[in-house]
Amino acid sequence: MAVSRGFQDFILDLLRPLDPVSRRMFSGVGLFHGGVMFGLLVRDILYLRVDETTREQFERAGSSPFTYQRGEREVSLSAYYVVPEGLLDQPDALLQWTRNAIAAARRSASSARPATSRSGVRQYRRTRNADSG
């Protein structure tokens, strides 16, 4: 599942206006913006983050989710879809799809964070103190 240096450089050059950060991950490369992962490079294929808001757009364009082999079975990671065919030849369109992927990654990150509130913290402390006393 390696990524060639040439493909990685090509994608980073296309996405340069968005100032992405790339990090090696296993045998692929993760693409980050503002602390959230919005893309994945695996086997010289670009995958972008989707959510319930953007998934249909990718499916209408004929894209499919990221899949990989794990032993005898195929695993599908439905949060990342392959970039639609021909999009790498349309830099402006690719940037818009990537902006949508960054927005999807942010929405997913914010919904995944546990809600915290001072009253919840106080309640926990009261309960904990009552149990120990």
What is each PLM-predicted segment?
Residues 1-133:
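Charge-dense, helix-prone N-terminal extensions
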